[in-house]
Amino acid sequence: MNLTLYDHTFPKLTGEQVENLAKYRDQVLLIVNTASKCGFTPQYEGLESLYEKYKERGFTVLGFPSDSFLKQEFSESEKTAEFCKVNYGVTFPLFKMSKMKGREMNPLFQELLQQTGEKKISWNFNKFLVSRSGHVYRYYGSKIKPEALKSDIESLLNE
């Protein structure tokens, strides 16, 4: 049996809560590897804006902090959570730190890469837009700002 993205379970960024991604079945998802000390970190603002705009229509952003690229994330989850909340007002779900390369790579991101044919997570803030059926609709690199995804998100929400 092949795993789907809904078969994955991850610990939330703070606290002991573990969340199964089945909770997000039938939603349009934007899955992003994030970092608090990166030149692309201001994208948190755009990600939160998308989440606020579309969450009532069945859209969710899922953030996965990572220090895989130049250690650009805090080592303590609480610092990451505070940074995101204080500086960018982040309310979308954030999960515990994940590896984005090597043998310990987050299995969800391995699956997302496989679906898109991309070879690797190239840097922080790689984005995967996932349809309600759980398939990757499109991959966006770090340089693509969240605001540029609005028409694709609306298209998927209207399906």
Which stretches of residues belong to each language-model region?
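N-terminal "domain-start" segment that seeds a small globular fold
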Residues: 1-22
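Surface-exposed acidic, glycine-flexible loop patches that form ligand/cofactor-binding
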Residues: 20-22, 52-53, 117-121
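Short clusters of small/polar residues that mark proteolytic maturation junctions
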Residues: 22-23, 141
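Proline/glycine-enriched tight loop/beta-turn segments at coil->beta junctions
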Residues: 23-29
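Conserved hydrophobic packing residues within short motifs/helices of P-loop NTPase cores
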Residues: 29-31, 62, 128
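Amphipathic alpha-helical repeat scaffolds
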Residues: 33-37
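Structural microenvironment flanking redox-active thiols in thiol-disulfide oxidoreductases
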Residues: 40-105
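Thiol-/selenol-based redox modules, centered on thioredoxin-like
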Residues: 107-110, 114-159
